[in-house]
Regions:
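A nucleotide-sugar donor-handling region in carbohydrate enzymes
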Residues: 1-46, 75
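Glycosyltransferase donor-sugar binding loop
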Residues: 64-75
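Nucleotide-activated donor-binding/catalytic signature segment of Leloir-type glycosyltransferases, i.e.
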Residues: 77-93
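Short acidic alpha-helix that forms the nucleotide-activated donor recognition element
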Residues: 92-104, 119-120
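Acidic donor-binding loop of glycosyltransferase active sites
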Residues: 102-113
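A short, well-ordered alpha-helix in the C-terminal region of glycosyltransferases
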Residues: 167, 174-188
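C-terminal alpha-helical cap of glycosyltransferases
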Residues: 187-199
Length: 199
């Protein structure tokens, strides 16, 4: 069973989906106030730091929530960076990702299932492909104008990330378009479809 229609998201994404999408569609605020950064639980390449430095370079005055797992090899580096910047709130081993996505105006996140979680809640996103198995989905999201995408490589530089963040942050119409397009890709009911398919 393949495809985003069968993505196994946690139940809370479907539970809050209608409320979140309704709020996004009626939101007339053109400015971004809250940015969520989640480049996977471990983020072994420390892409999170590149993202934070890009935001600093752009002089974006917003609230930033960074999510990492306790297993992240660069956790202490990010913790030290956050301690020097009152904009940044670092959260470790969270169990309320749906609510964090609900509160965000835009996100910078990894590809894979987490990108479908963002789609489910209509969260405008810059998706950073961090593994080969994420390429196909990321390409689909880009073609359907759901997310903007930066492909990861060993030579991934902050310049590409900075441009992607700047475009998403400044372009209100782009964010509105993403909020409309991305929920069509994933509705959070994949678990129910899987159960029905195997019965």
């Amino acid at each position: 069973i393949l495809g985003s229609n069968y993505a196994l998201l946690r139940p809370e994404f479907h539970q809050i989906r209608d409320r979140v999408l309704s709020r996004r569609s009626s939101n007339t605020r053109s400015m971004v106030k809250n940015i969520l950064i989640s480049i996977g639980s471990s983020d072994p390449y420390n892409i999170t730091l590149k993202v934070l430095r890009s935001i600093k370079l752009l002089k974006i005055n917003v609230n930033i929530v960074v999510v990492l797992g306790s297993c992240a090899p660069y956790l202490n580096t990010i913790r030290e960076y956050a301690q020097c910047n009152t904009q940044i709130k670092l959260l470790v081993d969270v169990n309320n990702m749906a609510n964090l996505m609900s509160d965000a105006d835009m996100a910078i996140g990894a590809g894979g299932v987490s990108s479908l979680e963002r789609c489910c809640l209509g969260l405008p996103s810059l998706t950073i492909v961090t593994a080969k198995n994420q390429v196909s989905l990321a390409k689909n999201l880009l073609e359907n104008k759901c997310h903007t995408v930066v492909s990861f490589s060993n030579k991934l530089d902050s310049y590409k990330i900075t441009l992607g963040i700047e475009e998403l942050y400044k372009n209100y119409r782009l964010r509105i378009s993403m909020s409309k397009n991305s929920p069509k890709v994933c509705d959070g009911k994949g678990g129910a479809r899987v159960v029905k398919a195997v019965d």
